Structures are given as structure tokens and as C-alpha cells.
Regions:
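H/E-rich (His + Asp/Glu) clusters that bind or coordinate divalent metals
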Residues: 198, 202-212, 217-352
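Acidic-and-aromatic substrate-binding clefts and catalytic sites of carbohydrate-active enzymes
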Residues: 34-42, 61-71, 95-104, 131, ...
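Hydrophobic faces of well-ordered beta-strands that scaffold small-molecule active sites
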Residues: 31-35, 55-58, 86-91, 121-123, ...
């Protein structure tokens, strides 16, 4: 009987050690690789320390944000306050795109940013959706004028993160979108709701340009933000990861799309995480600005982190305001959790 008890205890310990629990949340070192800290307020870095997170704050050329120069200033201020758990990506604009020397000016800016410690750059969807050249044509990411800039980044051993295109929902009417966070975003940002702008490049145009861009630069360390705008089907995303060994993706603001797919086929989504465990990076797209309420942002960030942890480590029945219907947590193995929450960020962004 004593031997049976010992064996059962060993089996129980082995099973529990193969997976994390919800209670392990604060014990595990984690990284959120997609934050926007556009303020000097330390609220989110303080929450990160409490929840055992390190952060990557991402500068980006967005009209709604302060300038990329001010974003970098905030990033460096935040890093000075929290040097052990915060790093950053820089960005550039397409101002003066058609002028002689545009690439040289961008490279000069990037050189300064890299000397300050930037781990790479972020490209945004205004490439392909907003910026036009002097001939009134949309500037797509595979345009050869980007090549010297990208080659410089590669030579510096830095990472290219890119939000190119949008969720496939962007080309649907609001009532046909699959997740509520997309429905809310495009209702509030009709300028980016491509269903309303059929004269703009199509979803396929955006994805094809991105694919040509990645194919053109096989030595580029590339992270497709937001599941690489292939959030609608993990099998479709898997095809790109198979084709491009230099590509990983973050999950920022697209975990609801994974949960939506989990409702109908949990095994498919879970197996995708296991099969591509080296290419998937945890991120939220959370942030703070100068007009934010720091206490509210801190609380929201903690709640987001907890809800995501439950989805990945447990097999509980869960709900989300972003998804219509219940879904079951994925209960991923411990080694997969370690990769998506920490090790992949270190590999793909060279985070410390």
C-alpha cells in the first residue's frame, strides 16, 4: 500500500509539474512585448514588477499618438526609472518619402536610436493604408525604397516588428465581424474600416505585399504584430510560418480571435500553439498616455494579464467581453508557456 501511495504521489507531482496553474501567475517570469508607454508615469512598470513582467514599449508612427521623437523620449524616461524590466523599439516616418536622401535620414535617426538601446523598429499600417507617393499611389511595404533601411537594420542585428494590413474583419460590415473588439475599434475608427473604402488596397493586397517583403529579406528577424494580420485562421498563419523561417508573430490585441476559434475547434488551436511554440510571442498592446488615468490603466493591465494567463494555462470554461460564447482554456504545457511568455521574446527581440 505504501508503494502505491508513493507511485500515485509521484504521478500527481509529475502531472502538476508539466503544467502551470492559475496560482503560478506571479511566480513565473513573463514578458509583454507590445506596450505603448507614452507617458513618464510609472504606473504600468510598477504593475509589471508586481506581476513579474518585463516590458517592451513600442514607438509607432500613429497620428493619434505624440510624435515618434516624443515617444522615444518617454521610452527613455521610463527605462531610466525601470532599467531592469523595460526596453524599447523605435520608429520612423515617411515624411519626405519622395525626396533625395530619405533613406539616409531615416538610417541616421535609427543609428541614434540603436545607440540609445532600441532593440529594433516598428512599422505600422499607415504603410499601405495612408501614405501615398507623389503619384498619388499607396506606398506598400515591398517598395524598394525601403530596402536600404531594412538592410541597415539587419546589419545592426535588430528586429523589425510590423503591423501591416488589418484583421480580415476590417473588410466586413460591422455586424459580420467575428469579435467584439474589432467591431468596437472600426466603429470608432471608420477611416481604417476598409469595408467603407473599397478603393483602397484589399486585404489580399496587404498580405501579399507583406509576404513579398519578408521573402525579399530572408536575413531579417521579423515579428508580425497582431498575429501577422492572419488572426482569422491558425492554419493560414501556420502556412506563413512554414514558408518564412525568419518570421514570428505576437498576439497583441488578437487573443480574442484565438478564443473565437477555440469555441469551434479547441484542439486545432491548442495543437497550433504546440506545433509553433517557438514562433509565438505573448503581447497585449496595452499602454498609457499623458491624459490616461494611471490607476485605471494599471488595473486594466493586471486584469488583462490574469485573464490571458487563465486562457493559456487552465482548461476552465471561460468568457470574454470580446467574444460571443464560452470557450475552454488551452492548458498548454509548461515548456510552451515559458516560450510564448518569455523565451521567444528573448530570442526574437534579444531582450535581456
Amino acid at each position: 500500500m505504501r508503494n502505491i501511495i508513493i507511485i500515485l504521489t509521484a504521478i500527481s507531482f509529475s502531472c502538476s509539474s508539466d503544467h502551470y496553474t492559475i496560482e503560478d501567475f506571479s511566480k513565473v517570469e513573463k514578458i509583454d512585448t507590445h506596450m505603448h508607454l507614452n507617458s513618464a508615469d510609472p504606473a504600468l512598470t510598477q504593475q509589471a514588477r508586481d506581476d513579474n513582467f518585463k516590458l517592451l514599449t513600442v514607438n509607432v508612427d500613429v497620428d493619434d499618438y505624440v510624435s515618434v521623437e516624443d515617444q522615444e523620449r518617454f521610452a527613455l524616461q521610463q527605462i531610466e526609472q525601470s532599467p531592469d524590466n523595460l526596453q524599447y523599439l523605435t520608429a520612423f516616418t515617411l515624411e519626405g518619402w519622395d525626396s533625395t536622401g530619405w533613406a539616409d535620414r531615416v538610417i541616421s535617426r535609427l543609428q541614434n536610436s540603436f545607440e540609445e538601446g532600441a532593440l529594433g523598429i516598428k512599422l505600422w499600417k499607415n504603410i499601405g493604408m495612408v501614405y501615398k507617393d507623389s503619384a498619388d499611389q499607396f506606398i506598400m511595404i515591398d517598395n524598394p525604397r525601403f530596402d536600404p533601411v531594412i538592410e541597415y537594420i539587419i546589419k545592426q542585428d535588430k528586429t523589425v516588428m510590423a503591423h501591416l494590413g488589418e484583421p480580415k474583419n476590417c473588410w466586413l460590415p460591422l455586424e459580420e465581424m467575428t469579435v467584439n473588439n474589432d467591431r468596437s475599434y472600426f466603429k470608432n475608427h471608420p477611416e481604417y474600416h476598409m469595408y467603407l473604402h473599397p478603393e483602397f488596397p484589399s486585404y489580399e493586397d496587404q498580405i501579399n505585399a507583406r509576404d513579398r517583403f519578408v521573402e525579399k529579406h530572408p536575413d531579417m528577424r521579423f515579428v508580425g504584430a497582431h498575429l501577422g494580420s492572419l488572426e482569422w485562421d491558425v492554419h493560414e498563419l501556420a502556412k506563413r510560418l512554414d514558408k518564412f523561417p525568419n518570421m514570428a508573430v505576437d498576439m497583441a490585441a488578437r487573443i480574442p480571435h484565438l478564443q473565437h476559434q477555440t469555441i469551434s475547434n479547441r484542439d486545432k488551436v491548442r495543437q497550433f500553439f504546440i506545433d509553433y511554440q517557438d514562433r509565438l510571442i505573448y503581447a497585449t498592446d496595452s499602454g498609457i498616455s499623458e491624459d490616461s488615468n494611471p490607476d485605471n490603466e494599471r488595473k486594466d493591465l493586471h486584469n488583462t494579464w490574469i485573464k490571458d494567463w487563465k486562457y493559456f494555462v487552465s482548461d476552465s470554461t471561460l468568457t470574454s467581453p470580446h467574444v460571443n460564447g464560452e470557450f475552454q482554456g488551452l492548458k498548454l504545457p509548461r515548456n510552451v508557456i515559458d516560450k510564448i511568455y518569455r523565451e521567444n521574446a528573448k530570442r526574437w527581440f534579444k531582450m535581456k
